[in-house]
């Protein structure tokens, strides 16, 4: 996705593992935002549940706070404005990270069977894989799973202890 024209905007917790996307952001070719990784993880769960967003104190009085930098990393993001909203909830200042539709979730699985069951036993971390897939599903988006050809197996051959989700 780190090619010009494939992305319009990105909201991420860090860019260290995506140097080409980082370059697009630095060259102001995409709107780039930086949000706390934990908030992004929780936001996927909120989107998956069909809720309006994440309400939290995390990010107040930091670069994410819309009264400061709003998490905006470049001019293109500043043109769009802050993604995060500051709100008053029960007399306390909070930040609201609104839900947005997930059009496509790109996921790698260790094994996938012919019915779409996905196992993740060889992945380095489970991280947010399931909530991302669920968020795309709830949004009416697509879940695209990559797997090595030799790891596309017959239905019933997966160890069910490692099946984490189903893609149909």
What are these regions (language model features)?
Residues 1-168:
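Conserved alpha/beta enzyme-core scaffold
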